[in-house]
């Protein structure tokens, strides 16, 4: 029987099983199936997926993320904050500002430390990708997808689509408590107009610096939080004139709050907590 040590961590309730690949060895061919198994709340550990903290040739660490359905994702805002916390607290980095490699590129992390423990992490998520081909999405001739008509099962909606290294589509709602997360979410996630699938966000605008947010994540379903989704929601809200550029926006997620800023320089900055839940050994 094989085994590996793990740390379970969460960012605003978005939990993953973190594996230190500097110390552990898991066959590449088993990563997808193991992500499914460890995520299972009944027969595994229970999580939204599995994240590997790996050696990198271009940064102190590299993050690989596997969703609970076994698919490999390119980016994860909540995961990045937890990787930053783990890397700093385990001595993988000494500076409080450092880079993390992801499948969608390098991102910069800055940790806030109190008594040797990381309490908050700010991630520079880079520039949003706004071209239809970058999301990607099939549809109208317009280069950007902003307040675009979108029909699902005979009903008309308006959507805005943004990539933060992974694809997001935003629906605005009047009341976040009645948002059709579990009904519309899974349909849109696999809509053929999004050839790589899509994360589906529902946003209620409170004012010009505050949003309520719920998400149906590609490959995971309903989660307590989605960092890249919160970033995409703020970018979409600026594009639609609902919030302001270069101004902090508080995004209220099911698991807590993130502070997001789309700077005048073009990058999106995300600040929020990261917490360790437990450590253990998984047998397979």
UniProtKB/Swiss-Prot annotation:
Compartmental location: Cytoplasm
Gene Ontology molecular-function annotations: diaminopimelate epimerase activity
Positions marked as site (Could be important to modulate the pK values of the two catalytic cysteine residues): 168, 217
Major location (coarse): cytoplasm
Annotated substrate binding sites: 14, 67, 77-78, 166, 199, 217-218, 227-228
Catalytic center residues: 76, 226
Domain of life: Bacteria
Subunit comment: Homodimer.
Family: Belongs to the diaminopimelate epimerase family.
Full protein name: Diaminopimelate epimerase
Name of the encoding gene: dapF
């Amino acid at each position: 029987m094989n085994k590996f040590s793990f740390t379970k961590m969460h960012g605003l309730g978005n939990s993953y099983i973190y594996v230190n690949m500097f110390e552990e060895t898991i066959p590449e061919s088993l990563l997808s199936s193991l992500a499914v198994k460890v995520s299972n709340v009944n027969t595994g550990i229970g999580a939204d997926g599995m994240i590997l903290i790996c050696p990198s040739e271009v940064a102190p660490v590299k993050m690989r993320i596997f969703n609970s359905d076994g698919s490999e994702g390119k980016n994860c805002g909540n995961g990045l904050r937890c990787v930053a916390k783990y890397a700093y607290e385990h001595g993988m980095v000494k500076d409080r500002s450092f880079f993390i490699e992801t499948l969608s590129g390098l991102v910069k992390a800055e940790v806030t430390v109190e008594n040797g423990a990381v309490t908050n992490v700010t991630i520079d998520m880079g520039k949003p990708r706004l071209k239809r081909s970058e999301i990607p999405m099939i549809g109208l001739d317009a280069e950007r997808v902003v307040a675009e008509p979108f029909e699902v099962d005979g009903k008309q909606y308006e959507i805005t689509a943004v990539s933060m290294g992974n694809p997001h589509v935003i629906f605005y709602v009047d009341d976040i408590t009645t948002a059709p997360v579990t009904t519309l979410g899974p349909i849109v996630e696999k809509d053929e107009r999004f050839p790589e699938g899509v994360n589906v966000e529902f946003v209620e605008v409170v004012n010009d610096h505050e949003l309520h947010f719920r998400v149906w994540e590609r490959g995971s379903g309903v989660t307590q939080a989605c960092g890249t989704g919160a970033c995409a929601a703020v970018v979409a809200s600026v594009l639609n004139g609902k919030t302001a550029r270069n101004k902090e926006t508080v995004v209220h997620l099911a698991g807590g709050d993130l502070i997001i800023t789309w700077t005048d320089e073009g990058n999106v900055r995300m600040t929020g907590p990261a917490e360790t839940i437990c450590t253990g050994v998984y047998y397979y």
